[in-house]
C-alpha cells in the first residue's frame, strides 16, 4: 500500500512525530521536550504554547529527516497525554491559564468535598471513574472558579475546553474543529460511557456549561484538515485516541482478555473486556478502549502515577545515575540480601489505592544500602505496582479471560532487567513487540485504516510480531516473601483517609 501516515504523539514531557510508510514501517521520528512547571506543592502545569510549538517542530523535523513534502502525507493520527485540561478563548485561541496536567493534585479538596456529599457512586456509575484529581472534570471546574471572569465568559460561550487532543485539533485546523474522541472523553469525569454522551447531571454538579465541551467522535473519524500555512499542505486528521488506548490498539489487543501495559512516566495496564462494561469492585477504572464505526469496546484500566518517573528521580533527584539507561545495570549489581522497598507515592498513589495524600517512602535501609539498592528498589516498585493492578483485574473478571500474558511497551521496556523482574513478580510471561512505538502505531493505524491505505483490524492484528518473551524464573516462596514485604510497605504509606 502507498502513502505516508503521520502520527503525532503528544506526551507528558515531550512531543513526538513519527512518519510511517504504506507498509507500516517507521520512516522518521522527531522529538522535542518542553518545560514542566510546578507552581506549588502537588501542582503540575504545561504552557499550551510550549506544547503547540513542540508539536509543530517535531513534525517539521520528521518531514525533513524523511525527505518528504507535507503533501506526501495522506493522513494524521493524534495520540496524547490524557486528562490534562486546557481552556482557551474561542475568538483568539489563547489559553486563559496554563494546562493543568494529569499528575496535578490541586483539586483533591474538591474531590474530597464531592465524596463527602456522597456523590462518588454517581460519578463512577456514569463514567466508570473515581473522584480523583487525576481526571479532567475537576480541573475544568478549578479553572472556571479560579481564573478571573472565566465562569462568566464560559456561560456566555466565549471559551472552549478540552484535553490536549482537542486543543491540538483546534490549533491544527485553524479553529475550525472543536472535537475529541470517545477515549479522551471517557477520561474527563463528565462523559457517560454507557450512553456515549456528555452527562448533564455531572456537568451540573461541577457547574460546567455543555457548550464549553467538544463534539465526541469515533477514534477513526474526520477531525478536519490542517491549515496549509502550518506544514505547507492541508492534511486530513483521521484518527485520535488517548495515549493508553492508542497503545492498546498498537499492541493489537483487540480481543477480550488481551492485556497491555505501558511503562513511561507512569504505568498503565489496560485489559480489553469487549462489548461488556465491567463495573470494577476493586477500584480499577472502567473505561472505553476504543470506539470504531459507532461500536464501543470497553476496558478495565489500572493507572500508576510513578513508573519511569522513579528512574528520573534516581537521576535528577538523588543523582545516583547519570542516565536513565544505567538503572538496570546498577540494579543488577545490588546486594540481594538487602530487601529495600520504595513506595513511589511522590504525587499520591493511583490504582487500586487511590490515595491522593500518600507520599513516597523507603523501607528496609541499612548502613550498607547504596545506589545499587536504590536502583533495584525503584525498578522493583514498578513490578510490584503492576502486580497489584493485575490482582485487582483478576478479582473483577474471575477466570473469564484465562491465563495472563502481558504485552509491554514504553521506554522502560528497553531494560531487560526490569522486564525480567516484571515477569518474576507477576509469575506470567511478558511479551515485548518488535515495534516499540506502539502508541504512535495505534494512532497511525486509526488514521491509515480510515484513509484506506492501511489494513483492516484483523490483518493489522496478524502483523503484530514478538521481539522477546520474558518467562518467570523466580522461586514461588521468594516471590511470596517479596510481595508480602511490598504489601506491608504500602500499608505503612497509606493515609488514614485512603479507601483501602
Curated annotation (Swiss-Prot):
Keyword Transferase set for record: yes
One family name in Pfam for this protein: FGGY_N
Gene name linked to the record: glpK
Residue stretches spanning the membrane: none
GO MF annotations in UniProt: ATP binding; glycerol kinase activity
PROSITE patterns found in the cross-reference section: FGGY_KINASES_1, FGGY_KINASES_2
Function: Key enzyme in the regulation of glycerol uptake and metabolism. Catalyzes the phosphorylation of glycerol to yield sn-glycerol 3-phosphate.
Origin superkingdom: Bacteria
InterPro entries found in the cross-reference section: ATPase_NBD (IPR043129), Carb_kinase_FGGY (IPR000577), Carb_kinase_FGGY_CS (IPR018483), FGGY_C (IPR018485), FGGY_N (IPR018484), Glycerol_kin (IPR005999)
Name of the protein described by the UniProt record: Glycerol kinase
Top EC class, one word: transferase
Similarity-based family: Belongs to the FGGY kinase family.
Organism annotation: Chelativorans sp. (strain BNC1)
Catalysed reactions listed for this entry: glycerol + ATP = sn-glycerol 3-phosphate + ADP + H(+)
Activity control, per UniProt: Inhibited by fructose 1,6-bisphosphate (FBP).
Positions with a binding annotation for ATP: 12-14, 265, 308, 312, 411
Assigned GO CC terms: cytosol
Chain residues that bind sn-glycerol 3-phosphate: 12, 82-83, 134, 243
Tagged with keyword Transferase: yes
Chain sites annotated for binding ADP: 12, 16, 265, 308, 411
Amino acid at each position: 500500500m502507498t502513502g505516508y501516515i503521520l502520527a503525532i504523539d503528544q506526551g507528558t514531557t515531550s512531543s513526538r512525530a513519527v512518519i510511517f510508510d504504506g507498509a507500516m514501517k517507521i520512516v522518521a521520528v522527531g522529538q522535542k521536550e518542553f518545560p514542566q512547571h510546578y507552581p506549588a506543592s502537588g501542582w503540575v502545569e504545561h504552557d499550551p504554547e510550549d506544547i503547540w510549538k513542540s508539536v509543530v517542530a517535531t513534525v517539521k523535523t520528521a518531514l525533513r529527516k524523511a525527505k518528504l513534502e507535507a503533501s506526501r502525507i495522506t493522513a494524521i493520527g493524534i495520540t496524547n497525554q490524557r486528562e490534562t485540561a486546557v481552556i482557551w478563548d474561542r475568538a483568539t485561541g489563547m489559553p486563559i491559564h496554563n494546562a493543568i496536567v494529569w499528575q496535578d493534585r490541586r483539586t483533591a479538596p474538591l474531590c474530597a468535598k464531592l465524596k463527602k456529599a456522597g456523590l462518588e457512586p454517581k460519578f463512577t456509575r456514569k463514567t466508570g471513574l473515581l473522584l480523583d484529581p487525576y481526571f479532567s472534570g475537576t480541573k475544568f471546574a478549578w479553572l472556571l472558579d479560579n481564573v478571573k471572569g472565566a465562569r462568566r465568559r464560559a456561560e456566555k460561550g466565549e471559551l472552549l475546553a478540552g484535553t490536549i487532543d482537542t486543543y491540538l485539533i483546534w490549533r491544527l485546523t485553524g479553529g475550525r474543529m472543536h472535537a475529541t474522541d470517545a477515549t479522551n472523553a471517557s477520561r474527563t469525569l463528565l462523559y457517560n460511557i454507557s450512553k456515549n454522551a456528555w452527562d448533564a447531571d455531572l456537568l451540573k454538579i461541577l457547574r460546567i456549561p455543555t457548550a464549553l465541551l467538544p463534539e465526541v467522535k469515533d477514534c477513526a473519524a474526520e477531525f478536519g484538515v490542517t491549515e496549509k500555512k502550518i506544514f505547507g499542505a492541508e492534511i486530513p486528521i483521521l484518527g485520535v485516541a488517548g495515549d493508553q488506548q492508542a497503545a492498546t490498539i498498537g499492541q493489537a489487543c483487540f480481543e477480550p482478555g488481551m492485556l497491555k501495559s505501558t511503562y513511561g512516566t507512569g504505568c498503565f495496564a489496560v485489559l480489553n473486556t469487549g462489548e461488556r462494561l465491567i463495573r470494577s469492585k476493586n477500584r480499577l477504572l472502567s473505561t472505553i478502549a476504543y470506539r470504531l464505526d459507532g461500536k464501543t469496546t470497553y476496558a478495565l484500566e489500572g493507572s500508576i502515577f510513578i513508573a519511569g518517573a522513579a528512574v528520573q528521580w534516581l537521576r535528577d533527584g538523588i543523582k545516583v545515575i547519570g542516565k536513565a539507561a544505567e538503572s538496570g545495570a546498577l540494579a543488577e549489581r545490588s546486594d540481594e540480601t538487602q530487601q529495600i522497598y520504595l513506595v513511589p507515592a511522590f504525587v499520591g498513589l493511583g490504582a487500586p489505592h487511590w490515595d491522593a495524600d500518600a507520599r513516597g517512602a523507603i523501607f528496609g535501609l541499612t548502613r550498607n544500602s547504596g545506589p545499587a539498592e536504590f536502583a533495584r528498589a525503584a525498578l522493583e516498585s514498578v513490578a510490584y505496582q503492576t502486580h497489584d493492578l493485575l490482582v485487582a483485574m483478576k478479582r473483577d473478571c474471575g477466570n473469564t479471560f484465562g491465563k495472563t500474558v502481558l504485552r509491554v511497551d514504553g521506554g522502560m521496556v528497553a531494560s531487560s532487567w526490569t522486564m525480567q523482574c516484571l515477569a518474576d513478580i507477576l509469575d506470567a510471561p511478558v511479551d515485548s513487540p518488535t515495534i516499540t512505538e506502539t502508541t504512535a502505531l495505534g494512532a497511525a493505524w486509526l488514521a491509515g485504516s480510515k484513509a484506506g491505505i492501511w489494513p483492516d483490524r484483523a490483518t493489522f492484528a496478524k502483523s503484530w510480531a514478538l521481539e522477546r518473551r520474558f518467562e518467570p524464573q523466580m522461586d514461588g516462596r521468594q516471590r511470596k516473601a517479596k510481595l508480602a514485604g511490598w504489601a506491608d510497605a504500602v500499608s505503612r504509606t497509606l493515609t488514614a483517609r485512603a479507601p483501602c
